[in-house]
């Protein structure tokens, strides 16, 4: 099976604009634990304790190559984002990033 190559930044922007996402470690952990998240995106510098809590769930995890300082602006936010949950992808193809 061939893995589809997508532009992660563009896909994240589209998910933020057309879907439903939540940001913040605690809210992301909760969404992963209760199954409402379709996918979790973790910045490369996300703290290990947060990564472990999220990876203990069955939710697909995308490890973003950039840091939290880079992930925030990609998502159109004026702050850092270490962890975010995608509840509804909208018109984005972001789920293909973990396929």
From Swiss-Prot:
GO cellular component, one term: cytosolic large ribosomal subunit
Example GO biological process: translation
Matching PROSITE patterns: RIBOSOMAL_L30E_2
Residue intervals passing through the bilayer: none
A Pfam match: Ribosomal_L7Ae
GO molecular function terms attached to this record: RNA binding; structural constituent of ribosome
InterPro entries listed in its UniProt record: Ribosomal_eL30, Ribosomal_eL30-like, Ribosomal_eL30-like_sf, Ribosomal_eL30_CS, Ribosomal_eL8/eL30/eS12/Gad45
Keyword terms, alphabetized: Ribonucleoprotein, Ribosomal protein
Family stated for the protein in its record: Belongs to the eukaryotic ribosomal protein eL30 family.
NCBIfam families assigned: PRK01018.1 (NF002172)
Record-linked PANTHER family: RIBOSOMAL PROTEIN L30
Protein name stated in the entry: Large ribosomal subunit protein eL30
């Amino acid at each position: 099976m061939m893995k589809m190559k997508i532009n992660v930044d563009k896909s994240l922007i589209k998910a933020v604009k057309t879907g439903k996402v939540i940001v913040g470690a605690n809210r992301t952990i909760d969404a992963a634990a209760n199954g409402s998240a379709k996918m979790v995106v973790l910045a490369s510098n996300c703290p290990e304790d947060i990564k472990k809590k999220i990876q203990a769930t069955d939710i697909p995890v995308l490890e973003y190559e950039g840091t939290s300082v880079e992930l925030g602006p990609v998502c159109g936010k004026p702050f850092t984002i270490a962890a975010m949950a995608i509840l509804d992808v909208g018109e984005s193809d972001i789920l293909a990033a973990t396929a």
